[in-house]
Amino acid sequence: MVNKNAIILAAGKGTRMKSKLYKVLHEVCGRPMVDHVLTEVEKTEPATVVTIVGHGAEKVKDYLGDRSQYALQAEQLGTGHAVLQAEDLLKDQDGITIVVSGDTPLLTAGTFEKLFAYHHDKGAKATILTATAPDPTGYGRIIRNDIGIVEKIVEQKDTNDKEAAVNEINTGVYCFDNKTLFQALHEVTNENAQGEYYLTDVVEILKKKGEIVAAYKMPNFEESMGVNDRVALSQATKVMRQRINTAHMRNGVTLIDPESTYIEVGVKIGNDTIIEPNVVLKGNTTIGSDCFVGAGSTIIDSTIEDNIQITSSTIESAIMHTGSNIGPNSHLRPNAEIGVDVHVGNFCEVKNAKIGDRTKIGHLSYVGDATLGTDINVGCGVVFVNYDGVAKHHANVGSHVFIGSNSNIVAPVEIADHTFIAAGSTITDDVPEKAMAIARARQTNKENYWAKLPVAKDEEWQ
């Protein structure tokens, strides 16, 4: 088996992005562009991956960690100069090396493997990945001779009129014989319009030495898209979204309107789940089978088990167990855990709380920093009062408890099993098992008081 290495070019400043964020760290469907590239490269099982970093180097290293080795390009002197920075890490290795830009998030491992195979079949020292561009402006052109052999690559600013009319472009991905690559790089000069050391000049150097230079034309130009500004970022995101959504539908998920459904890379969805329009699924989210996610819902970094109904609600870093349901217009905040067959109705919020099986929280309630047992009824307008202005406090509620509407549960407090909280109560003390707690002022009726009220003199109120 041929030894494979990879060099990822990630040193560009990305000035056209007009951003404080390092270009290759801009996200496409939830992951930085350079992560997409590295993930696909890793699928080809390279022996060594070297990422060339420059501006914002530490942020790239922090994100990718030990998945790659790194070489610093302190000055931006061109792609040839960038690749040369990996020399100390790779120059003595046999085999082949792929060079790919860190801002091409749509490239796939399948394309890389086809490039490797073509390179091997042609016995080439260098193979260029090319594509036919509808509009080649801005790309380096592939110049072939009369019998179709690659002669050179000409950068946009160095083209003449005839060369500029060529629509076969250089995608910026190459496969080289590793040792040949670094030998040739030392012969590259910066005698061009940009005053830079072009990696593309290696092609001409090898041709002059009589080496075989091949070009594999990929069938899908869209896959080669490089991202240099926010417009291209949105275009790449659109393509990636379509890939992701298509994969889920082929795996048995119903997307009512794929065009309006945003699902990030890494989200897992079981079969026979239905996703309505304008749903957003992000981060490390898993959704089971036979679920329903209603229009306008957002789920982030959460686990949704089987047979769950979510109606127009937001769920963040939470867990919903089998058979539960939520919404419309409710919010599970971080560390909320909803038990089996639990009902969380409309306009409710649950935060840092565990809700036991079969408990019902019907509407207009807040449950924060609490543990609730099983088979509880939480009435309308119940508030778990968890913050004293300085610190958060926890409330524990047992099982088989009835909490009447408009009650306040002031933590820290313990409410035992089989208890009843009367409507309108403000509970500040522990409630023992099988007790009923009433904590409100006694009602007073004042006879004939109506006549003393100002409205009594208004004819409309007579």
UniProtKB/Swiss-Prot annotation:
GO annotation, cellular component aspect: cytoplasm; membrane
Cofactor(s) it depends on: Mg(2+)
Catalytic activity: alpha-D-glucosamine 1-phosphate + acetyl-CoA = N-acetyl-alpha-D-glucosamine 1-phosphate + CoA + H(+); N-acetyl-alpha-D-glucosamine 1-phosphate + UTP + H(+) = UDP-N-acetyl-alpha-D-glucosamine + diphosphate
Compartments, as annotated in UniProt: Cytoplasm
CDD domains reported in the protein's UniProt record: GT2_GlmU_N_bac, LbH_GlmU_C
Entry binding sites for Mg(2+): 103, 228
Gene Ontology biological-process annotations: cell morphogenesis; cell wall organization; lipid A biosynthetic process; peptidoglycan biosynthetic process; regulation of cell shape; UDP-N-acetylglucosamine biosynthetic process
Residues covered by region (Linker): 231-251
Alphabetized UniProt keyword annotations: Acyltransferase, Cell shape, Cell wall biogenesis/degradation, Cytoplasm, Magnesium, Metal-binding, Multifunctional enzyme, Nucleotidyltransferase, Peptidoglycan synthesis, Repeat, Transferase
Binding positions (UDP-N-acetyl-alpha-D-glucosamine): 9-12, 23, 73, 78-79, 101-103, 140, 155, 170, 228, 333, 351, 366, 377
Role, per record: Catalyzes the last two sequential reactions in the de novo biosynthetic pathway for UDP-N-acetylglucosamine (UDP-GlcNAc). The C-terminal domain catalyzes the transfer of acetyl group from acetyl coenzyme A to glucosamine-1-phosphate (GlcN-1-P) to produce N-acetylglucosamine-1-phosphate (GlcNAc-1-P), which is converted into UDP-GlcNAc by the transfer of uridine 5-monophosphate (from uridine 5-triphosphate), a reaction catalyzed by the N-terminal domain.
Subunit and partners: Homotrimer.
Protein name: Bifunctional protein GlmU
The organism's taxonomic lineage, starting at the top: Bacteria, Bacillati, Bacillota, Bacilli, Lactobacillales
